[in-house]
């Protein structure tokens, strides 16, 4: 009888060659208890999220907040100074007054509690107008990313960081580091994994994209962003409940992993799509879905700009395959979910609900049509909006 040996799972190499780990462990060159006399710096929610993403290796190869050479190279060339693909400047802003009083090893705090350290190697001036134009493609403060940029300090601190403990937050069972996600993928024997980024509840069009992709690969990493978002986005706790009921009823459990992505949204559209893809490579994904207006807001970016920007790099540089999908919707004449590639009917036949329209219906206590979202998801959302 012929026997077949199962080949071991080979996960993609993290960006930069190895997974960064900047989480404090006993035996390191310092003990957190010995830092009582060091200067302190309170982090915003976004900077705390950046600290975690750096320290756990999600933002490999970054080992800290970027210095000026990397900052300018990212802005102007979508690469680190050494040529590695990277599209968002991960910086630590402070005021000029704060910067003047900080040097050496600084204790980073959040809510007054120590969460990590920064070894300051560099202080430099933020070039906000340039950053806004190149990263967000606008200087309008109506853009939430630009508004945040202009509101923060004018000096950036750079240097390696250490995180004392991974903040598991509201969803400890689903809060996994890149190393932990990689362990799950290996344990399940997935040789190919597609990651799906979302900051919204999953509607039928998203489900369609995920399941089309799941026909091509072994596993789906459903990776909702739970960091800071803008005020009118659906809260993370509501979204997580919606994801869980959807997965229980409509997805193969052994081929699906729900794990949170703790980054904050910057709404940088195409540039943010690149970091979303590269970081999912660090989590162990081999494929990444990019749909219409990925990480966009308002009308600042073209519908498929976030797909086209990946042409900036070679496939070898990216190290993760980008699955580009067109806009999908329910066609009443076709009687199913379709895209412009598969549907011959005009828009009068299509059921499309904007996020604004969905929120209006939910606040009014109205049901969402089953062609748009699963009834179980609609019920979770309806309850959340009518409490």
Curated annotation (Swiss-Prot):
EC number: 2.7.7.4
Catalytic activity: sulfate + ATP + H(+) = adenosine 5'-phosphosulfate + diphosphate
Pfam families: ATP-sulfurylase, PUA_2
SUPFAM superfamilies listed in its UniProt record: Nucleotidylyl transferase, PUA domain-like
Pathway assignment: Sulfur metabolism; hydrogen sulfide biosynthesis; sulfite from sulfate: step 1/3
Annotated keywords: ATP-binding, Nucleotide-binding, Nucleotidyltransferase, Transferase
Protein name stated in the entry: Sulfate adenylyltransferase
Organism: Deinococcus radiodurans (strain ATCC 13939 / DSM 20539 / JCM 16871 / CCUG 27074 / LMG 4051 / NBRC 15346 / NCIMB 9279 / VKM B-1422 / R1)
Lineage per the UniProt record: Bacteria, Thermotogati, Deinococcota, Deinococci, Deinococcales
């Amino acid at each position: 009888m012929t026997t077949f040996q199962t080949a071991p799972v080979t996960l993609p190499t993290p960006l930069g060659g190895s997974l960064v780990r900047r989480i404090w462990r006993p035996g390191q060159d310092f003990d957190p208890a010995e830092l009582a006399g060091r200067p302190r710096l309170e982090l915003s929610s976004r900077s705390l999220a950046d600290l975690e993403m750096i320290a756990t290796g999600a933002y490999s190869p970054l080992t800290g907040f970027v210095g000026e050479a990397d900052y300018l190279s990212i802005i102007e060339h979508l690469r680190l100074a050494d040529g590695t693909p990277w599209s968002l400047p991960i910086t630590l802003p402070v005021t000029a007054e704060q910067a003047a009083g900080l040097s050496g090893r600084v204790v980073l705090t959040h809510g007054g509690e120590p969460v990590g350290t920064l070894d300051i190697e560099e202080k430099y001036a933020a070039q906000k107008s340039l950053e806004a134009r190149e990263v967000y493609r606008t200087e309008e403060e109506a853009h939430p990313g630009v508004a945040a940029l202009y509101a923060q300090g004018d000096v950036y601190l750079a240097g390696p960081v250490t995180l004392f403990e991974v903040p598991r937050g509201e969803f400890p069972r689903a809060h996994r580091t890149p190393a932990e996600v990689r362990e799950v993928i290996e344990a399940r024997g997935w040789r190919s994994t597609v990651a799906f980024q979302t900051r919204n509840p999953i509607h039928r069009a998203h489900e369609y994209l995920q399941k089309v992709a799941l026909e091509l690969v072994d596993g789906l990493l459903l990776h909702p962003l739970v960091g800071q978002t803008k005020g009118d986005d659906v809260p993370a706790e509501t979204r997580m409940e919606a994801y869980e009921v959807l997965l229980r009823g409509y997805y193969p459990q052994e081929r699906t992993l729900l794990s949170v992505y703790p980054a904050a949204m910057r709404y940088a559209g195409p540039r943010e799509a690149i970091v979303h893809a590269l970081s999912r490579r660090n989590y162990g994904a081999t494929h990444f879905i990019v749909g219409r207006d990925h990480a966009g807001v308002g009308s600042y970016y073209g519908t498929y700009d976030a797909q086209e920007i990946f042409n900036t790099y070679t496939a070898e540089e990216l190290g993760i395959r980008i699955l580009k999908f067109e806009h999908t919707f329910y066609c009443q004449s076709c009687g199913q979910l379709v895209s412009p590639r598969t549907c011959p009917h005009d828009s009068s036949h299509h059921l499309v609900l904007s996020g604004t329209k969905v929120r209006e219906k939910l606040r009014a206590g109205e049901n969402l049509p089953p062609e748009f979202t699963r009834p179980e998801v609609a019920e979770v959302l309806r309850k959340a909006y009518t409490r």
